[in-house]
Amino acid sequence: MARFFRRRKFCRFTAEGVKSIDYKDLDTLKAYVSETGKIVPSRITGTKAKYQRQLATAIKRARFIALLPYTDSHE
């Protein structure tokens, strides 16, 4: 029987020593938003709860100011 070993998920923000997540840093925020525009959960990305809360708030702020779209482009 084959055993699959998953790579250990780690929090990128903890590793880089980030104090707070800025809503104007769009490159970082886009990495944590799915193709459909949903915020990717921490169980998939591996971010810690503290940073996941900051990330969600930053994404919501960026959406409100129209820096990020709420959904994907409908064609």
Curated annotation (Swiss-Prot):
Gene3D superfamilies: Ribosomal protein S18. InterPro entries: Ribosomal_bS18 (IPR001648), Ribosomal_bS18_CS (IPR018275), Ribosomal_bS18_sf (IPR036870). Keywords: Ribonucleoprotein, Ribosomal protein, RNA-binding, rRNA-binding. It comes from the Bacteria. One of its GO terms (biological process) is translation. GO terms for molecular function: small ribosomal subunit rRNA binding; structural constituent of ribosome. SUPFAM superfamilies: Ribosomal protein S18. The keyword Ligase does not apply. One of its GO terms (cellular component) is cytosolic small ribosomal subunit. The keyword Cell cycle does not apply. Binds as a heterodimer with protein bS6 to the central domain of the 16S rRNA, where it helps stabilize the platform of the 30S subunit. HAMAP family: Ribosomal_bS18. PANTHER family: 30S RIBOSOMAL PROTEIN S18 (PTHR13479), SMALL RIBOSOMAL SUBUNIT PROTEIN BS18M (PTHR13479:SF40). Belongs to the bacterial ribosomal protein bS18 family. NCBIfam families: S18. Part of the 30S ribosomal subunit. Forms a tight heterodimer with protein bS6. This is Small ribosomal subunit protein bS18. It comes from Saccharophagus degradans (strain 2-40 / ATCC 43961 / DSM 17024).
